[in-house]
Amino acid sequence: QAISYQGIGLHSGEPVNMVFKPAPENTGIVFIRTDIEGYPSVRAHIDNVTNTMRATTLEHGEAKVFTVEHVMAAFSAMNIDNCYIEMDSPEPAVGDGSSAIFVGLIEEAGIQEQTAPRHVYKITRSHAIYDGDRFVVILPYDGYRITFTSVNSHPLLGTQNCDFEVSPESFKEHISAARTIGFMKELEQLQAMGLAKGGTLDNALVYDDEKCLSVPRFDDELVRHKALDVVGDLFLLGRIEGHVIAMKSSHELNSRLARSIMEEI
């Protein structure tokens, strides 16, 4: 059944009404801008990614949506292949800054099994994207696994490691509730760039130079959220089987990896 949710965008700070509706087989995940005449839509696919600075942006014709990674991570982990998402603003609601709200909405709406065979891209050789000391690699693997290492100079963060098999159970327990991170010293700069206008101490893990201003949900919440972003960004390629190993990866590197895999499909 359809289900709705209202909130504000993390970066835009704009209010948004979202309606999640069942979609036929082989539709994919489709965002529909109901605030634009003609209700233009954009399919959640790597070919439609146009920007990866601080968030992942999709664009097709007049339809543009950004910061889609938290929604996409929930759809990926909860095994949702087809859904229409109607939005009257360009950015999904931030919720609590994680994917937990979207996991809850999926469970509340219910999941309908469809009869078309699910297509899965099985990785048969390694793909690697490097950028200085940052990298993301995918290797052949029987299943879907994410191993992420985050390195941050903040004294309370340092090096964090995360390793998990992507399944509805593991995602809900270990990953979905991890929130995006922010630093007070960057806030003015980000807002001058039109970003982080909807960020608060409740929907982000916020640090000043010495302490965490939010209440952490995990000791390693930062790296868990980074792994969440990988799940969301790579679902723009589709379902995959492989082992992703990442060090300080970003939306840009995640998208470049998806494009590298796409070239062989």
Regions found by a protein language model. Give the residues of each.
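C-terminal regulatory domains involved in ligand/effector binding and gene-expression control
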Residues: Q1-D81, E86-I265
